[in-house]
Amino acid sequence: MAGLPGALPLLTAEEEASLARTIEAGVAATAVLAGHRLRVDATRAELERIAAEGEQARERFLLSNLRLVAFVTNGTAGRDPVVSRQEVFQEGVAAMAGVLRSYDWRRGRFSTIAVPTIRRRVIEYVASRGGMLGVPAHRAVLIRRARSIAARLESE
């Protein structure tokens, strides 16, 4: 993750909204191309172009927010010897992509909405991979904290 290869510069609020609108248009165009009955006054070629632009906007949006995922996952990655930093980062990226699918740019900045979801998914992932299957994520975090404190007290 050093330097985050492929990461693009952060988006301004205006760029974020513009990309989100392009993504929405691309999703709608893809739905029409897939046979959903929506009334549009566009040719197949125009719909294909709009769908491609939507996919490019989605990719740019995700790449521009990789630093957000790195920021959120840095607090969790590396604490558990069972789960690697790369695994935690990948889970964070998957969570970010999920948030983007339901993101409504009219309701605020992406980071405000995405950070809690990414953090929750990463914590749940680490808890489930750290040998605590079946334990709720918040309880796994508490157990981990208690074990860490107990180990520190024993070493003193």
Residues of each region from the PLM?
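Alpha-helical promoter-recognition and RNA polymerase-docking modules of transcription initiation factors
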Residues: 1-134, 138-152
